[in-house]
Amino acid sequence: MLTYVRTSLFDSPAQTLVNTVNLVGVMGKGIALEFKQRYPAMFKAYKSLCDRNEFEIGKLHLWRSQAHWVLNFPTKTTWKKPSKISYIEDGLKVFAASYRDMGITSISFPPLGCGNGNLDWAEVRPIMEQYLSKLEIPVYVHDRQVTKGFIPEHKEVSFERIPVSFEDFLQDIREQMHAHSGTFATLKGRTLFGAKWHDDGGILIESPGRASQIHPEYIEWAWSALQSGIVSADQFPGDDSRKAKSYLFAILAELPYVRVTEIRKPEWSENTPAHGLYIKREDRNADMNSVDVPHDPGNQLCLSL
């Protein structure tokens, strides 16, 4: 279940984030430096592994904290040398064979070996698709190559909580509908429509020339999908639900903790990206102020074939 996403890796709803690293214990630039700053205990464990010469190409280092997991994926031998396609493939082979054993339930990758690694994304992408597209967990690749300007600008709004129950979620939707006086605009095309609650728990939609309904089960599907990652149109079974999706997405996008992103599936045309929604979890950013904790060997794994 591979999806390309245009968001920061650190905004991902995935359980595990992939950090591209070298074998000499240095995280001095790019995404690795940001990982080091956000997860100092992870960096300490990784550096210790490198100092003992126990890390190599084709090995993966999984570091687990209570909130987030980080998978250190070696794409370079040293920061002084570029990446190689063979390094990427060696690591992906290990990941595809061992992600279940590691307990990984969802994961976000950057374009492996690109950027500071100097690899061409046109060469890396098919390798990543080969190993990741058929895995049985949500896999997100934060691909900055996707067409820019597709997503309407979304205001950053602070929020005090994320709902823990479907009932709280419904109440938040009701409050947003009241705040907007029942008037919203679709994400694509910005077409205005009206929305009001139906007695059965669904939402009645009034748009130019037609009326329709978002059934209660569609809202439940969206809630369930948001708990596990990014919700997209292809998760809505049937034509009726997909038509209702464009209205439901517009309403949900107004919730202060929901973010809109551009997504694309490997099987889609390059020119047909779509919208996805995910919950912005503020605790990703809280790690910027985290404090080192004593090293616990039980919090990490180092695997190879």
Stretches found by the model and what they are:
Residues 1-249, 253-305:
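Macrodomain-like recognition of ADP-ribose-binding/processing modules
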